[in-house]
A protein has these predicted regions:
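A short acidic, often aromatic-flanked loop/helix-cap motif at beta-alpha or helix-coil junctions
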Residues: 62, 84-88, 300-305, 385
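Short, surface-exposed loop/turn motifs with a glycine/proline- and acidic-biased composition
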Residues: 384-398
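Flexible phosphate-sensing "switch/lid" loops adjacent to ATP/NTP-binding sites
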Residues: 1-9, 14, 19-207, 213, ...
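C-terminal lobe/tail of nucleotide-utilizing enzymes
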Residues: 200-355, 364, 373-382, 388, ...
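Long, intrinsically disordered, low-complexity Ser/Thr/Pro-rich regulatory/activation regions
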Residues: 396-406
């Protein structure tokens, strides 16, 4: 049985590693067997846990390090993945196949380090390693300390995009029927099949009910702006967000009177900072549709080690609100008319956004939704594939796209079609 997986995502410096480690400690103290994994090449997980962790690969020389063992059965292990080592291992398998298929190339002379500049390749290999760890049966919960926001989003969204584009550029039925009598071509097909199967497995894993992300931020305007974009991108790409954690919040002591304070730079700074944080949190609520927040305190000292990390979450407060926006779920129905005059509509609940950020397009059987720099292909229901788009409207956070039958491909005499099919 695969473990639950929680990905901690956030801008560098917001305390992402600290919150990931604290969550892992809390789960272990509750009796679960937990693994906390760092996929960030700038590893700091061992520093936060107060224990040396040797970066390594699952199954390689470095095994997860035991951090905590509780009498009630809870355990905490930690590992820092070396994604460059994963890349070297994968390239050793792929390079000979590619070199045979393309004999005039110099692929055998390419060092794995040269491929590390290819966007997303190390992130996806790291994600594959996380999936293997979660599926090993050794742990109940795997907590992942991701790299900074842009790298983490690439890791979480690339599998589904890659699977779609491989299938569109070289469909499986063509791959399996091309040059099977040519050993070089057969080896190439086998390599692509293996890659496609791996990324499809990862895409399916990320869409599963036991996987979610935890967005970590600090109450600062620049950080909030990036977090809102990340929240929107994850929803559009179909990745579930479990919670939004605001770190380093200055709490007011309810037993203390904050008015008429003596004139002193320390009091002035504290009062101004609390006011600024309150305004930023209000802005965050407005920009995200008032999602519920977990607020962790700004401590005088760094929380290092399991005991201090557990206390950090014990002191956290919660701000009520709605659940973070979930993955897109298209709803298709018939709005009016019959035959060639039928109007169908596709409705999608989007995260809060400015209409100027939204773009729409169509490519064959897919609706392409763009929000900022993120693009998502949504497979149209079978009835809509025989229709043309007549218009779209965004009201609040609900997007409605309307279709009518295309007379060139619509079955003669048909009165509408079945609602459904692949999304």
């Amino acid at each position: 049985m695969s473990a639950r997986i929680g990905f901690f995502v956030g801008k560098g410096g917001v305390g992402k590693s600290t919150l990931a480690a604290a969550t892992a400690v809390q789960a272990a103290l509750a009796g679960e067997k937990v693994l906390v994994v760092s996929t960030d090449q700038a590893h700091s997980l061992g520093d936060v846990l107060g224990a040396p962790i040797q970066p390594g690969r699952p199954g390689g020389e470095s095994e997860p390090v035991r951090i905590l063992a509780e009498e009630q059965g809870g355990e905490l292990d930690a590992v820092e993945l070396d994604t460059l080592a994963l890349l070297e291992s994968a390239w050793r398998l792929a390079a000979p196949v590619l070199a045979v298929r393309f004999p005039e190339s110099d692929l055998n002379d390419v060092a794995p380090e040269e491929l590390s500049a290819v966007p997303g390749i190390q992130e996806v290999l790291g994600l594959g390693a996380v999936a293997d760890l979660a599926g090993s049966g050794r742990w109940d919960y795997v907590v992942v300390d991701c790299a900074s926001t842009a790298d983490a989003l690439r890791m979480l969204t690339l599998p589904s995009s890659f699977a779609v584009y491989v299938e569109r550029s070289w469909p499986r039925h063509r791959r399996l029927s091309t040059g099977l009598d040519d050993p070089r071509q057969a080896a190439m097909v086998a390599l692509v099949e293996s890659m496609h199967a791996q990324v499809a497995r990862l895409a399916e894993l990320l869409a599963g009910p036991d996987v979610g992300t935890h967005l970590v931020l600090t109450p600062e305007r620049v950080v909030v702006a990036e977090t809102v974009r990340a929240l929107t991108a994850l929803a559009v790409m179909g990745i579930r967000v479990n919670e939004v954690i605001v770190n380093q919040v200055l709490f007011q002591d309810d037993s203390f009177e904050y008015r008429n304070l003596p004139e002193h730079p320390a009091f002035d700074w504290y009062a101004a900072r609390i006011g600024e944080q309150t305004a930023v949190l209000d802005h965050l609520a407005a920009a995200t549709g008032d999602v519920k927040l977990i607020l962790t305190p700004h401590l005088a000292g760094e929380p290092i080690g399991p005991k201090a990390l557990a206390q950090l979450l014990d002191q956290a407060r919660r701000r009520d609100g709605g659940t973070p926006p979930g993955p897109l779920r298209p709803i298709v129905d018939r709005e009016s008319g019959s035959g060639l005059e039928t109007i169908y509509r596709l409705r999608l609940q989007l995260p809060p956004l400015d209409s100027g950020e939204l773009s729409l397009g169509r490519a064959g059987d897919d609706l392409i939704i763009g929000v900022g720099a993120v693009r998502r292909r949504v497979r149209l229901a079978s009835v809509l594939r025989r229709c043309i788009v007549t218009g779209a409207a965004l009201r609040g956070s609900e997007l409605t796209v309307r279709f009518r039958p295309d007379p060139l491909v619509w079955p003669a005499g048909a009165d509408g079609g079945a609602i459904g099919g692949d999304q």
